[in-house]
């Protein structure tokens, strides 16, 4: 019997039994019989920041000689301090010797870095090194936490907020479809606007299993007060919810305001029983390309059945992640372990903080309603009656300056743009001059 005839007979006999459709080819490329994850179809357009990169490339094709200045994506531009890069170089060089070579490290991270984070980032908060999980960045931790929670949890997010919380939830199957206004069914959107001082009315927030909360907030730049975070923790304790607190920008909270504006959720009594904190070396040490972050999962945080959340998160980390780069972790230790290292990264943060101040002054001088920029590297500017993408496009067209449309952070961002302080001082000053010429 010919081979092709045998194949056809096998398809008829086996495929129906497996309830699998055979590969198809209908006037185009051959397709597999694998069904697409239906949750991917729910996602709106592309992810925000790659979409902006596409707009930039289109603009440069139109204006090939344009000197584009990016005040868009939050990517650092200042060099990493030499005390940090020297530590990474020394670690990397040691890998070329028999004595210094190291392969896989602990999935949870090197013990010395976990201890430095517990001692230096969370002094007097009772955080143990065993509760710190080193990662390749806060955004990756958000995805791993969504894997941990699974598809059956309900989630709440600030509106506007970092889009990764929502998109990961959609991919995991935690939501329904988006309506015409961009709101996904099944997500509780906590409105954070100038009218409520960028903090939601918690008495009107529907109970959810997980609450994503970013402070200082990306994109609004608002840093929640101690009293506001006390209310948030109280809500979580009352409802039996888990807070995922994103403190990636906590180093931008000035020392003068730190007494009233916590840098960590664990400064609030009772938070250890209801909160996970994720953070990153990206924005305070310039590690956007190096990739290093961490999550804190306290021992006291338990599921409804009494199982520690940390036990399951450890399993997720061990299953999905082989640990952060040892070279990157050596840099993290250098950032925290000495006064010189801490001072060096603080000076870098100071550059961006001053850039934010210049941006705030520029927009205020133009009569614009401006928020943020004090305890965060982002400035949130309102353009009443305008659509965010239209404002973004007009500024790019007229000034060759890239911003971020506020609607990309959720429906509550419509009518705003986010302006980033992450660029060199010269370029920020040049961008401000262009904006003044256009908006005056």
Swiss-Prot record:
Molecular function terms, GO-annotated: pyridoxal phosphate binding; transaminase activity
Binding residues for pyridoxal 5'-phosphate: 104, 218, 246, 249, 280, 282, 291
Entry EC no(s): 2.6.1.-
InterPro entries: Aminotransferase_I/II_large, DapL/ALD1, PyrdxlP-dep_Trfase, PyrdxlP-dep_Trfase_major, PyrdxlP-dep_Trfase_small
Keywords: Aminotransferase, Plant defense, Pyridoxal phosphate, Transferase
Entry keyword GTP-binding: no
Cofactor dependency: pyridoxal 5'-phosphate
Biological process terms in GO annotation: biosynthetic process; defense response
Family the UniProt entry places it in: Belongs to the class-I pyridoxal-phosphate-dependent aminotransferase family. LL-diaminopimelate aminotransferase subfamily.
Function: Probable aminotransferase that may generate amino-acid-derived defense signals and be involved in resistance to pathogens.
The protein, known as: Aminotransferase ALD1 homolog
């Amino acid at each position: 019997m010919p081979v092709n005839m045998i194949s056809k007979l096998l398809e008829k006999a086996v495929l129906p039994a497996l309830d699998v459709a055979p590969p198809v080819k209908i006037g185009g490329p051959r397709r597999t019989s694998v069904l697409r994850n239906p949750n991917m179809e729910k996602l709106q357009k592309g992810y925000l920041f790659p979409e902006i990169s596409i707009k930039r490339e289109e603009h440069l094709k139109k204006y090939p000689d344009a000197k584009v200045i990016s005040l868009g994506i939050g990517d650092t531009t200042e060099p990493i301090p030499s005390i940090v890069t020297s530590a990474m170089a020394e670690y990397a060089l040691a890998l070329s010797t028999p004595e210094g070579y190291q392969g896989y490290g602990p999935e949870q991270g090197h013990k010395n870095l976990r201890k430095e984070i517990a001692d230096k980032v969370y002094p007097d908060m009772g955080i143990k090194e065993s509760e710190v999980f080193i990662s390749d960045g806060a955004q990756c931790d958000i995805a791993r936490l969504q894997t941990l929670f699974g598809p059956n949890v309900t989630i709440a997010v600030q509106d506007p907020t970092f889009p990764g919380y929502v998109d990961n939830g959609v991919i995991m199957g935690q939501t329904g479809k988006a309506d015409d206004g961009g709101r996904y069914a099944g997500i509780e959107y906590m409105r954070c606007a100038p009218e409520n001082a960028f903090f939601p009315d918690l008495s009107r927030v529907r109970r959810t299993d997980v609450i994503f909360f970013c402070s200082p907030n990306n994109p609004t730049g608002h840093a929640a007060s101690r009293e506001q975070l006390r209310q948030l923790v109280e809500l979580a304790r009352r409802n039996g919810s888990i807070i995922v607190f994103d403190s990636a920008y906590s180093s931008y909270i000035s020392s003068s305001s730190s007494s009233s504006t916590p840098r960590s959720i664990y400064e609030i009594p009772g938070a250890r029983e209801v909160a996970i904190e994720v953070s990153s070396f990206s924005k305070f040490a310039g590690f956007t390309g190096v990739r290093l972050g961490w999550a804190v999962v306290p021992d006291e945080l338990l599921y409804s059945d009494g199982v520690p959340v940390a036990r399951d998160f450890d399993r997720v980390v061990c299953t999905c992640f082989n640990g952060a780069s040892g070279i990157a972790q050596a840099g993290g230790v250098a950032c925290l372990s000495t006064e010189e290292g801490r001072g060096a990264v603080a000076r870098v943060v100071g550059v961006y903080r001053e850039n934010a101040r210049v941006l705030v002054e520029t927009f205020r001088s133009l009569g614009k309603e401006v928020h943020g920029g004090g305890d965060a590297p982002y400035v949130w500017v309102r353009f009443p009656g305008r659509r965010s993408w239209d404002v973004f496009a007009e500024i790019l067209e007229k000034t060759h300056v890239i911003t971020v449309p506020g609607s990309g952070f959720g429906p509550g961002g419509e009518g705003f743009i986010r302006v980033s302080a992450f660029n060199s001082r010269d370029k920020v000053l040049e961008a401000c001059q262009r904006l003044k010429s256009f908006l005056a």
